[in-house]
Regions:
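Canonical positions in the second alpha-helix
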Residues: 29-30, 63-64, 109-110, 143-147, ...
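Register position in tetratricopeptide repeats
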Residues: 9, 16-17, 50-51, 85, ...
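Start-of-helix register in tetratricopeptide repeats
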Residues: 5, 39, 78, 85, ...
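Short coil turns that delineate tetratricopeptide repeat
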Residues: 1, 35, 69, 115, ...
């Protein structure tokens, strides 16, 4: 669509100059004129995130990421990369401030946009654990595990859950959760903890 190309060209100059407010205004008009222009959508999402409106950007990135037409494959990859980039940047800032409630609120923002957001569920769970809200971890972990599409990520969730049970001295539940850690970097630690918990339980019962 010729008009969309014109909007891309107009918005490109302020975007490259990091004048995201002006670029967003132009790209928003272009996206409204051509809602199937995923390249424009990605630029608009970036502008919103750079302006501090992460949720608005996330809505757009999720819209792009949901496209299954092969012609949008490159745009889908870029949208997913943008979600990861801006999520990690925001989390790093909040972690640096030890603002666990801020991280939880941020994850809730992401879940408001997409309740099946596996990354948001995991971020939220980790923040609950870091603030020592073990009851919150226990209440949320199964839901978080259910939306993970990767076995390694699911194992990470069960590792956090097992650690929460262990912190509350709920040994059988801790063993059960840690036994579900079957992939990723926490397998050895989970197995070691399970062995230790079983040994301690055996000593207590002898």
């Amino acid at each position: 669509m010729l008009m969309a190309k014109i909007y891309l060209m107009w918005g490109g100059k302020p975007f490259n100059e990091k004048n995201y407010a002006e670029a967003a205004e132009i790209f928003a008009k272009g996206y409204a004129a051509d809602p199937k222009n995923m390249e424009m959508a990605n630029f608009l999402g970036i502008c919103y995130c750079e302006l501090g409106d992460f949720q608005k950007g996330l809505v757009i990135f999720n819209e792009i990421a949901s496209q299954d037409n092969p012609k949008y494959a490159e745009d889908v990859v870029k949208a997913k990369e943008n979600i990861k980039l801006y999520t990690n940047n925001r989390i790093a800032k909040l972690q640096g401030e030890n603002d666990f409630d801020g991280i939880i609120a941020f994850a809730d923002e992401m879940l408001a946009v997409n309740p099946q957001d596996a990354l948001a569920q995991k971020i939220r769970l980790q923040a609950l654990f870091d603030k020592k809200d073990y009851a919150g971890v226990i209440a949320s972990a199964e839901e978080a595990a259910a939306v993970q599409i990767d076995e390694e990520e699911r194992s990470d969730v069960y590792f956090i859950l097992g650690a929460a049970y262990n912190a509350r001295t709920m040994t059988p539940q801790a063993i059960d959760a840690l036994s579900k850690v079957t992939a990723g970097t926490n397998v050895a630690a989970a197995q070691k903890t399970v062995a230790q918990l079983k040994e301690n339980a055996a000593k207590a019962n002898s």
